[in-house]
């Protein structure tokens, strides 16, 4: 299968992880348009420092494929219709490319990826746009192969925003794409490091995103920025930690969950039980993570974990992250739409 991956060429963790997985699986049969500059090695430190999180984990990993330069050149005029699947990554910033693409290819070959942290679906997030404009954008999605999204709310009314709250419940779903597909972040398989409990020297990672817990553990840092500027130091700190504190921030899913698990820190996830079932991360439960509400609750739960129980938690955490490599996430997404791809 040949895939054309259309994107706005700006850092986005979901688009980056999906493209990394697709390129790992399909090689030269996955063409990025335009060239996804920050994904390729070598990448300069100044570029990484402009990316949220200093570009840890996902950026500057891929080997460039010079022959794809010829394929990209004049592609809209010469060979735009030569692919089996078209992925519009980051629909909020790429909808104009979708509009252009629909002039050339079958709608049923187009997969939409919504990488936004909001649980609103395109185009319902910005209702300052005229209703005519919103309706036109919504029609762009009609009959597309699928709409992949991380943050999927429990109630469809939340997907369209407060301006539409007066509609009957039965109409909400009609405002959304026909086929909604869950998707999550992923982590390159090469970033998984297998650490044993015996190698642990501290209970928690240095940087803690839960301000209340960080304030109790005075030696731990809570900031809105990152505690490390070097990926190697960041990973080393995780690897010597038994647990990593994580929470919902802009959205439920974030790369931190996967970085912690890949480096051997069992996730302690605040209010995980409140996460909508279809929202990422998927597959976390009491067998591979700790759900807590506050510091007292967390302390009580951790104190009740025996050494052998922690070892089992860690094993299950590794099983979970092995199912959420970039390649595994990409493979599941393709499998979910492959039977419905039109045959030429």
Regions found by a protein language model. Give the residues of each.
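A charged, aromatic-enriched C-terminal amphipathic alpha-helix characteristic of glycosyltransferases
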Residues: 307-341
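Conserved acidic donor-binding segment of nucleotide-sugar-dependent glycosyltransferases
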Residues: 285-295, 304-307
């Amino acid at each position: 299968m040949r895939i054309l991956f259309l994107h706005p060429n700006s850092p986005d963790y979901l688009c980056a992880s999906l493209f990394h997985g697709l390129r790992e699986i399909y090689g030269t049969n996955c063409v990025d348009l335009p060239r996804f500059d920050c994904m390729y090695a070598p990448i300069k430190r100044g570029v990484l420092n402009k990316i949220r999180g200093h570009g840890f984990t996902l950026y500057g990993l891929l080997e460039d494929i010079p022959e794809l330069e010829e394929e990209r050149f004049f592609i809209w005029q010469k060979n735009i219709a030569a692919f089996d699947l078209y992925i519009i990554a980051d629909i909020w910033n790429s909808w104009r490319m979708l509009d252009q693409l629909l002039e050339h290819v079958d709608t049923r070959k187009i997969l939409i990826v919504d990488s936004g942290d909001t649980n609103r679906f395109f185009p319902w997030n910005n209702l300052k746009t005229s209703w005519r404009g919103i309706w036109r954008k919504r029609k762009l999605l009609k009959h597309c192969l699928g709409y992949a999204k991380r943050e999927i709310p429990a109630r469809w009314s939340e997907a369209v925003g407060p301006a539409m709250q007066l509609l009957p419940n039965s109409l909400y779903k009609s405002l959304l794409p026909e086929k909604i597909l869950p998707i999550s972040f992923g982590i390159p398989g090469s970033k998984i490091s297998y650490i044993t409990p015996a190698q642990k020297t501290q209970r928690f990672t240095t940087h803690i995103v839960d301000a209340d817990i960080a304030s109790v553990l005075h030696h731990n840092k809570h900031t809105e920025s990152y505690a490390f500027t070097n990926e190697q130091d960041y990973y080393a700190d995780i690897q010597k930690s038994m647990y990593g504190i994580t929470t919902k921030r802009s959205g439920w899913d974030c790369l931190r969950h996967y970085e912690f698990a890949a480096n051997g820190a069992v996730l302690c996830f605040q209010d995980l039980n409140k996460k909508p079932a279809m929202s990422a991360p998927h597959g976390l439960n009491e067998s591979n993570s700790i759900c807590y509400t506050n510091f007292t609750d967390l302390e009580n739960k951790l104190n009740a974990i025996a050494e052998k129980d922690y070892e089992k938690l860690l094993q299950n955490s590794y099983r979970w992250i092995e199912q959420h490599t970039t390649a595994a996430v990409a493979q599941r997404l393709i499998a979910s739409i492959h039977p419905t791809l039109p045959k030429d």
